[in-house]
């Protein structure tokens, strides 16, 4: 297995047609913000997620998704990660490029949020759309055990705010979560 990281349009253009089994795409979410991942204020990763219009954003995605379709094998599949901001646009683009009949499933990635918002409900999930290039797609079922404590642990761990006012888990001097 090979994982490629970078501007997927530039990478996709170098890939032979009908040669890829699976694509996982995590595009910008149309947040209209600069996204930064940092550790102690040292920026480790940053990208612009700002657009002049939703049409520009949709064109950005469409060009890339057309290339994804080109490089997928006939038995290939694509998973596209998005959130509530543009998921309805992305679903229509995917239907247009791959065909609505190639939609296989929608995965809901649910996560816990503690709501203290005065403006309404906070988002607590993201979407991953699963499309195939044809009806002859490959899908290998893998069964694993679920952790019976995953959600309980998330609920029980104490939280605090960091210097950027983000909620983080409290840890002791050894780096262990405090329950």
Stretch-by-stretch model annotation:
Residues 1-179:
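Core catalytic lobe of class I
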């Amino acid at each position: 297995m090979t994982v490629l990281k970078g501007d997927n349009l530039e990478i996709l253009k170098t890939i032979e047609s009908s040669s890829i089994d699976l694509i996982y795409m995590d595009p910008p979410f149309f947040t209209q913000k600069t996204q930064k991942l940092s550790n102690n204020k040292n920026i480790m990763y940053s990208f612009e997620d700002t657009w002049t219009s939703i049409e520009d954003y949709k064109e950005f995605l469409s060009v890339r998704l057309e290339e994804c379709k080109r490089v997928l094998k006939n038995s290939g599949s694509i998973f596209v990660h998005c959130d509530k901001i543009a998921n309805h646009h992305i679903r229509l683009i995917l239907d247009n490029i791959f065909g609505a009949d190639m939609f296989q499933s929608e995965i809901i990635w649910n996560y816990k949020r503690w709501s203290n918002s005065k403006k309404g409900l906070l988002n607590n999930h993201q979407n991953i759309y699963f499309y195939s290039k044809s009806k002859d797609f490959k899908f290998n079922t893998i069964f694993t055990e679920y952790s019976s404590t995953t959600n309980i642990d998330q609920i029980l761990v104490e939280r605090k705010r960091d210097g950027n006012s983000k909620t983080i888990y409290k840890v002791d001097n050894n780096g262990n979560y405090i329950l």
